[in-house]
């Protein structure tokens, strides 16, 4: 649950910024996974058990987001809460990318899937951003992990959109 500000002032809202940022990161992650899977499964013709199992693991990881988000919001300057929040997002990113690779492997002759090229290296950029956040949190700026998670999720969305537009316009590899 998001707490309500104690008064109708910007200052009261600002006190709760960690809650709102963490909630926003969680929402963007859920939306992006749903939207990406929606687009991916529109063109997939065959899936195997590996795809189903990896998506089941991904769903489990997603169910952990509210728990770790709440822990983070209770103490955004805790290395333990920052670390577990970041590790969850790393796990989600890795599992999602593994699931996409599994989809490609289970449907290797699907021309639409090959053209869409969901299995690309650009998907690893958000993971690198989160890892940079770990470096920040453990060296100079404790909230670095959750800020890097926000940046990574936004990058994930932007990269996917640019990539999709590039494929639609014939600018990416086909």
Question: Where are the regions a protein language model picked out?
Answer:
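Multi-pass alpha-helical transmembrane bundle typical of ion/small-solute transporters
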Residues: 1-174
């Amino acid at each position: 649950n998001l707490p309500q500000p104690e008064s109708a002032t910007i200052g009261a809202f600002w006190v709760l910024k960690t809650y709102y940022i963490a909630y926003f990161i969680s929402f963007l992650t859920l939306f992006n996974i749903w939207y990406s899977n929606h687009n991916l499964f529109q063109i997939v013709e065959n899936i195997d058990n590996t795809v189903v199992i990896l998506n089941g693991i991904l769903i489990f990881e997603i169910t952990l987001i509210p728990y770790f988000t709440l822990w983070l919001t209770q103490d955004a300057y805790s290395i333990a809460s920052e670390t577990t929040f970041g590790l969850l997002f790393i796990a989600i990113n890795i599992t999602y990318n593994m699931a996409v690779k599994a989809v490609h492997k289970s449907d290797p002759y699907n021309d639409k899937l090959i053209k869409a090229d969901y299995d690309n290296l650009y998907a690893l950029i958000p993971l690198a951003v989160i890892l940079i956040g770990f470096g920040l949190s453990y060296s100079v700026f404790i909230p670095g992990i959750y800020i890097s998670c926000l940046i990574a999720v936004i990058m994930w969305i932007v990269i996917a959109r640019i990539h999709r537009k590039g494929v639609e316009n014939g600018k990416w590899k086909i």
